[in-house]
């Protein structure tokens, strides 16, 4: 077992890893146990009682965080020329089509989200092997394949994120930064949980939300008391 650093020991001394905490308390505690020199991300991990191998139990959704992610999301819009100016005006970082497809094929991936249009998906679809494994492939369910690219850009910049359960039945997503106030972290995390609660598959049996953990980059995970979250 790796030896704990002084900072890790300090963090662990501030809470009991065997206890569960209310979401409100955890949102404040996460700021106290994070010692990174940079503004670390705050993440939530929710273990669900679903079988992702079954198509009718694949949990996927979209949530707009009330206070955003705290991250400057880099957006590429792949669109026809008539929509290019709208995308730029909405705040897209990169706008184009064939030129950016070639850049991506050449290894360029300096982006966080790609938004495109149904009419050009035939071209974008050829990038599936590159974008798919990196979770960058545009998807209609995520709102990133749309005719209204300007609205999609604004939504993403405002804190709209999409998530899906992984093969282990866990949903992992960011709910802000350590620099956020406890109230901002709480409200963002609660929004994710409320959206997840509404997405319970009809075919899922037993306990739906099995565990919730709040953590930051490099920090220990704080177990959340599910009873502290209304609607679960």
Curated annotation (Swiss-Prot):
Q: Which GO terms fall under molecular function for this chain's record?
A: rRNA binding; structural constituent of ribosome; tRNA binding
Q: Which UniProt keywords apply?
A: Repressor, Ribonucleoprotein, Ribosomal protein, RNA-binding, rRNA-binding, Translation regulation, tRNA-binding
Q: Which GO terms describe its cellular component?
A: large ribosomal subunit
**Record keywords: Kinase included?**
no
| Function field | Binds directly to 23S rRNA. The L1 stalk is quite mobile in the ribosome, and is involved in E site tRNA release.
HAMAP family, alphabetized: Ribosomal_uL1_B
Q: How does it assemble?
A: Part of the 50S ribosomal subunit.
Q: What is this protein called?
A: Large ribosomal subunit protein uL1
Q: Which organism is it from?
A: Cytophaga hutchinsonii (strain ATCC 33406 / DSM 1761 / CIP 103989 / NBRC 15051 / NCIMB 9469 / D465)
Q: What is the lineage of its organism?
A: Bacteria, Pseudomonadati, Bacteroidota, Cytophagia, Cytophagales
């Amino acid at each position: 077992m790796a030896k704990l650093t002084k900072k890790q020991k300090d963090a662990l001394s501030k809470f009991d890893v065997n206890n569960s905490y209310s979401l409100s308390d955890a949102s404040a505690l996460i700021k106290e146990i994070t010692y990174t020199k940079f503004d670390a991300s705050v993440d939530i991990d929710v273990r669900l009682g679903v079988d992702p191998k079954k198509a009718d139990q694949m949990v996927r959704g979209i949530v707009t965080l009330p206070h955003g992610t705290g991250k400057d999301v880099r957006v590429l819009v792949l669109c026809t020329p008539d929509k290019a100016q709208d995308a730029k005006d909405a705040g897209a970082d990169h706008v184009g089509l064939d030129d950016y497809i070639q850049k991506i094929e050449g290894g360029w991936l300096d982006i966080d989200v790609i938004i495109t249009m149904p009419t050009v998906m035939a071209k974008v679809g050829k990038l599936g092997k590159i974008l798919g494994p990196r979770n960058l492939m545009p998807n209609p369910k995520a709102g990133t394949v749309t005719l209204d690219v300007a609205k999609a850009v604004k939504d993403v910049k405002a804190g709209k994120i999409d998530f899906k359960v992984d093969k282990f039945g866990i949903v992992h997503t960011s709910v802000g930064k350590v620099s956020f106030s406890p109230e901002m972290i709480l409200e963002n995390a609660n929004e994710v949980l409320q959206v997840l609660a509404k997405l319970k598959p009809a075919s899922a049996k037993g306990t739906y939300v099995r565990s919730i953990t709040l953590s930051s980059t490099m920090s220990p995970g704080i177990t959340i008391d599910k009873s502290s979250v209304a609607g679960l």
